[in-house]
Amino acid sequence: SAASDVYKRQMARCAKRGQMTVVIGGRNKEEVFWKDLFPKTLKQLIVTTDDGSYGIKGFSVSVLPELFAEEQVDEACICGPGIMMKTAAQMAADAGIYCEVSMERRMGCGTGTCLACVCDKADGGHYKVCFDGPVFNAQEVCL
């Protein structure tokens, strides 16, 4: 899609300038194999595993308080399990950092007609993730 192309280009530009820190996590070393897909020009790549078999032992959100306190973070872009996104988005909000979340929903039709992918708006109503998203300002959706 055009949106994903724009995102990829922006990520490549930021990473090339050494301005992007990426935090990834998984249950174990086998689940973070995709760490090698990120550009080597990142400012920082932080890897966490629940069992400590690779990187820092713990959940990915466990490194955010220190990262937010010690680094100049302009924006957080989060995807993953709902509870992790909710926790990370709240940490970003508490630190005064703009945050976007990528909502994962089953999408039946891709046009918003079937309503299989709806998520609640923070101020009431619903978003159709397939039509309105899938990326949203974290303050505008209920996580």
Language-model-detected regions and their locations in the chain:
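Conserved SAM-binding loop of SAM-dependent methyltransferases across substrates and taxa
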Residues: 8-12
